[in-house]
């Protein structure tokens, strides 16, 4: 195995380990919104993905329009509802989301041929307490950040079609 491939695999393994450490360092969930999102995903799991009754939003336009603002995110979270321990499901989902976010950021930096990409990501993680806190959340904004970094890399380095597809899923 050559040196570059070893560095790449080690970097990805480090991002995976960091993502799980961020989530499982504490037995608590970082943000109560994760409980809402995982429960909403559970409702889709139990009632089907086209379920559109939201009795908990009586005083919102969501009740009238029967639309879920985070529909794609809630579909993404359905597999994490197959665990008996809901907190574990939230934390596992958060670790996967943090890993995907950091991986997209890493890919964006590699696409732009930025040296020491893993070091820049580590600097980003510890740059402010709020960054680490947000990475610990089980919320859709983390994935949006990763997709935005990836879209920017395609914008700077060329690639209109990838930007189109990223925009469609983001």
Question: What residues fall within each predicted segment?
Answer:
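Helix-to-loop transition at the C-terminal end of transmembrane segments
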Residues: 21-35
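Extracytosolic helix-loop segments that constitute the early lumenal/periplasmic catalytic or substrate-binding loops
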Residues: 42-64, 72
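Membrane-interface transmembrane helices that cradle and orient dolichyl/undecaprenyl
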Residues: 148-163
């Amino acid at each position: 195995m050559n040196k570059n491939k070893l560095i790449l695999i080690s970097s990805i393994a480090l991002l995976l380990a960091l993502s799980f450490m961020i989530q499982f360092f504490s037995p608590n969930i970082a943000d109560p919104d994760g409980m809402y999102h995982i429960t909403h995903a559970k409702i889709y799991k139990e009632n089907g993905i086209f379920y559109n009754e939201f009795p908990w939003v009586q005083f919102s336009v969501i009740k009238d329009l029967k639309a879920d603002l985070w529909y794609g995110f809630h579909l993404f979270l359905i597999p994490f509802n197959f665990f008996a321990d809901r907190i574990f499901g939230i934390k596992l989902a958060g670790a996967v989301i943090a890993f995907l976010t950091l991986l997209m950021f890493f890919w964006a930096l590699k696409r732009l041929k930025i040296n020491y990409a893993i070091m820049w990501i580590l600097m980003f993680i510890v740059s402010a307490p709020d960054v680490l806190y947000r990475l610990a959340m089980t919320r859709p904004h983390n994935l949006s950040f990763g997709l935005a970094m990836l879209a920017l890399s395609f914008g700077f380095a060329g690639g209109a079609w990838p930007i189109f597809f990223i925009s469609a899923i983001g």
